[in-house]
Amino acid sequence: MKAVWYEANGAAEDVLVHGDMAHATPADSEVLVRLHASGVNPSDVKARAGSRPMGFDRVIPHSDGAGMVEAVGSGVDPSLVGSRVFVRNGQWQRASGTAAEYVTLAEGLVHALPDAASFAVGAALGIPALTAAHAVLKDGPVDGQTVLVHGGGGTVARLAIQIATDSGARVIATTGDNDKVDWIRDAGAVAVLDYRDPDLVSAVAAAAGSGGVGRIIDGECGRNLATSIDIISTKGTIVGYGSVLTPAPELAFLKMMFKEVTLTSILVYLLAESAADAYASIVADMLERGVLDVAVAATLPLTEAAQAHRLVEAGDRRGAVILTID
């Protein structure tokens, strides 16, 4: 099979190799997927650059992908063969991810992809959409709540806005990019505020009204934590799904305690199978109804994996970066 791999950490153009290798056959309870698209996420790029030890002599990167089930192992329903699917956790604690023509994965890591969604869209679901759904719905229904989504122009954040809105929440978003304000509004945010505003707490309060903000979703939780604690309503919840810029923030514990605020972190790789199945069903339903815009910023062929990694590293984009595999 055609694949991209690396055998050392480093810059994408220095370490990513495109070539041929044999593909595995599915073991018991596994599924073999012929991939047509591979999603490139920030975590994939950081892993290649050396944010954590490789763990394996050779790594095929990327956790997300989409394609067709080609074969199944013992214990898996054979009627799955020929199904359109998206996959998750392809390279989580494994050597073989989705930057290849084939991947074998446990059945629980493979989810139905609606006909309404392209393979490129499917490859943008595993980490971004399931993270967004988990951030919104982890603690139950949000119908009637006001939810604040920081960094609303980010891939996960914009999906979270749509999922929260479809779930009956009223969504306020922040951004530091004026060019993305309308794009964020199009996702369902009723107000889009500049997170750099020194009066952001007051601006959010005015937008939220008397009910306040019951839930905050943040991909840079540490940087915004002090402000989020000031914003959140009594007994509200702050959900962090990332904190690269400020990985070890100070915590105003007493201020949190006297508002009985819940601060929770989530990691999509650790999702229970039942939760992942539930979120995948929600995402699939929204795709089928045409109410989930999964933005794809760029599609490139597998041979241009290094350029795809550079695009993700550059940061300023509208949506996911996808490799097509034909």
PLM-predicted stretches and their roles:
Residues R223-L292, I325-D326:
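Glycine-rich phosphate-binding loop and adjacent beta-alpha segment
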Residues D199-S210:
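Short amphipathic alpha-helix with an adjacent loop that forms part of the alpha/beta core around
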Residues T98-A99, T175-W183, A248-F253:
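Short, glycine/polar-rich helix-capping loops at beta-to-alpha or helix-loop-helix junctions
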Residues P78, R88-G151:
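NAD(P)H dinucleotide-binding glycine-rich loop of Rossmann-like/cofactor-binding domains
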Residues A22-V40, A49-Q91:
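Glycine-rich beta-strand-centered segment in the early N-terminal region that forms part
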Residues R84, T146, R170, G236-T237, ...:
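Short glycine-centered segments of the SAM/dcSAM-binding site in methyltransferase folds
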